[in-house]
Curated annotation (Swiss-Prot):
Membrane-crossing segments per the record: 31-50
UniProt cross-references to HAMAP family, sorted A to Z: ATP_synth_b_bprime (MF_01398)
GO CC field: chloroplast thylakoid membrane; proton-transporting ATP synthase complex
Membrane-protein topology: Single-pass membrane protein
Alphabetized CDD domains for the sequence: ATP-synt_Fo_b
Gene: atpF
Superkingdom assignment: Eukaryota
GO molecular function, one term: proton-transporting ATP synthase activity, rotational mechanism
Protein name: ATP synthase subunit b, chloroplastic
Keywords (A to Z) from UniProt: ATP synthesis, CF(0), Chloroplast, Hydrogen ion transport, Ion transport, Membrane, Plastid, Thylakoid, Transmembrane, Transmembrane helix, Transport
Length: 181
């Protein structure tokens, strides 16, 4: 508690020795005149510097704005050119798509036509092969029938032909040949 009393008494002493902030009615003691003279000197002497600095800054800002506007114009012209190129590219792409579709249709029709021709050729080849096979089979059947007929006639002739009849046939054939010679 003694410490608290000691601190409070020191605070009272320091507040009595210090002056507080407030308005000082003594004009010369407050240095208002000195401050006014200093401020007017700064304004008078610094005006040219400040004016030239502001003019330089204003000129730089104007140049920066003009450069930005020029870049904007250039960017807009490049944008228009790019849009024109995009439109041309899209037209070319569309043309390529149409050509591709046309080519695809042509190839499809060609493949279908070739397929039909191949089917017709295979069908004709099949028919031709069947006809050849039929003719060959008919020929084989005729040969077989002829062979059977010859065998039957041979068997019948052997049964019918006697040695006496055979010599008569030979004599008859010789006499026929003798008249022709």
């Amino acid at each position: 508690m003694n410490d608290f009393l000691l601190i409070s008494s020191l605070a009272e002493l320091s507040s009595e020795t210090k002056k507080s902030f407030g308005f000082n009615p003594n004009f010369l003691e407050a240095n208002v005149l000195n401050i006014a003279i200093l401020l007017s000197g700064v304004v008078y002497l610094g005006r040219n510097f400040l004016t030239s600095a502001l003019e330089v800054r204003q000129q730089k800002v104007a140049e920066a704005i003009q450069e930005a506007e020029e870049r904007l114009v250039q960017a807009n012209s490049r944008l228009l050119e790019s849009e024109k190129q995009l439109t041309q590219a899209q037209a070319v792409i569309e043309e390529i798509k149409k050509e591709a579709e046309k080519t695809a249709r042509t190839v499809k029709e060609s493949i279908l036509a070739q397929g039909k021709l191949d089917i017709e050729r295979l069908t004709n080849n099949g028919k031709s092969s069947i006809e050849k096979a039929e003719l060959q089979i008919k020929k084989q059947i005729q040969q077989h029938i002829t062979e059977l007929a010859i065998q039957k006639v041979t068997v019948q002739l052997k049964e019918y032909m006697t040695p006496n009849l055979q010599s008569k046939v030979i004599d008859s054939n010789i006499s026929n040949l003798g008249g022709q010679l």
